[in-house]
UniProtKB/Swiss-Prot annotation:
Residue spans crossing the bilayer: none
Domain of life: Archaea
Protein's name according to its UniProt entry: Uncharacterized protein AF_0941
SUPFAM superfamilies registered for this protein in UniProt: AF0941-like
One Pfam family in the UniProt entry: AF0941-like
């Protein structure tokens, strides 16, 4: 099953200790978050256009990505901040609900290209 979600992948790397907890600060930057999801959408679309992914797979990935953004992104954002703080690294960032909306709308726009 195709599922591309760079934010979730990078968060997992930090929690598993594969990446330094200091990386969480960069990961939680709102511009970086938007760029990761934009890049994921482009990668998914390119897989479809190149014939490496079926239409159904791509549509499902967009659906799952949008569902993640709307229902889980802010929760994981806060959990990663808490995790970093438990390791002695305080992060003072907040996730603006408008960023979540922008990402969801972007996914909608790209999804229409399939």
């Amino acid at each position: 099953m195709l599922y591309i979600n760079s934010f979730l992948d990078r968060m997992g790397e930090i929690i598993r200790g594969e990446k330094s907890v200091e990386e969480a600060d960069k990961l939680l930057d709102q511009k970086n978050i938007f760029e990761m999801f934009r890049s994921d959408c482009e990668e998914i679309l390119n897989l479809y256009k190149s014939g490496k992914a079926e239409k159904e797979e791509v549509q499902r990935n967009f659906y799952l990505l949008k569902t993640y953004v709307v229902s889980q992104l802010s929760i994981h954002f806060e959990r990663l901040k808490e995790f970093a703080e438990s390791k002695g690294f305080k992060i003072e960032k907040k996730l603006d609900p408008e960023v979540i909306n922008e990402i969801a709308l972007y996914i909608d726009r790209v999804e229409k290209e399939v």
